[in-house]
Amino acid sequence: MELEGKKIIVTGGGSGIAAGCVRGYVRAGAQVVFCDVNDEGGKATETEANAQENATGKATYFHCDITDKTAVQEFFAKAIELMGGLDVLANIAGVERNKPAEDFVKDDIDFVFGVNFNGTVWTNQEAYKYFKANGIEGAIINYASDTGLTGMPNGAIYASSKAAVLGWTRTIAMDWARESNVRCNCVNPSIKTPMYKYWLETADPAVVEAYKASLKQQFPIDGDMGEVDTDLVPVMVFLASDGARYINGQTICVNGGLVMVR
């Protein structure tokens, strides 16, 4: 599935899944403008994406804190001006904090919801405003999580923020498709990322060991989490393509059967 001529904004492209998607979109021929607050990581992703052999697209990095609505508005204006338009938003940026549910404080909630939910709202609004004003039947791809469906040990705030993203996306999928034929979907990835490694390092050791021992039962395919480039990027390319124009309001679980088993 090729994306020649597509103009795509990606959030969180300084590392992990989003960086992999930036590279994948560029390989597929898209023009990509992406953001992060990690400038070192963002510039590295830009260099890596543009250095890929036979890649016909281009990636450009800008700094943007998606918790700041004004910053998001300014970022979208720059990105759209640079690319000459917008067809797809892949909103992938995300954060988490892990501790027993009874120990969470306001700062934890503000931090996690600020990126995961508020950032989703601000970026989605800017994309839709452009699509509606210009008659573009665009696509919005939000990142949620299986934890929004199943819960997560020591991750109550993270799981709650992702449940909020799922509810938001299903609602705008109804409203914005009816108004402007804009399609909105969620992806729930069970993919090895820096965030996953962080969870392994910071969660209760007993919980981590129990989780590792259960991987083979949790993931029917491979008995483990998937890889960004081989397992996730092809799904993201498809959802950004015209071939996915009739897919709307869906939660695509790229997880080797994890939720099915649970």
Q: What does each model-identified segment do?
A:
Residues 177-183, 247-249:
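Short, small/polar-rich loop/turn modules that mediate ligand/substrate recognition or access, typified
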Residues 100-101, 105-113, 204, 215:
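Substrate-binding pocket helix/loop in short-chain dehydrogenase/reductase
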Residues 2, 150, 237, 248-262:
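Short C-terminal tail/terminal secondary-structure segment
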Residues 3-33:
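Canonical Rossmann dinucleotide-binding motif of NAD(H)/NADP(H)-dependent dehydrogenases/reductases
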Residues 145:
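Residue(s) in the substrate-gating loop at a strand-loop-helix junction
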Residues 124, 161, 169:
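Active-site helix of classical SDR
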Residues 186, 207-247, 254-256:
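C-terminal helical subdomain
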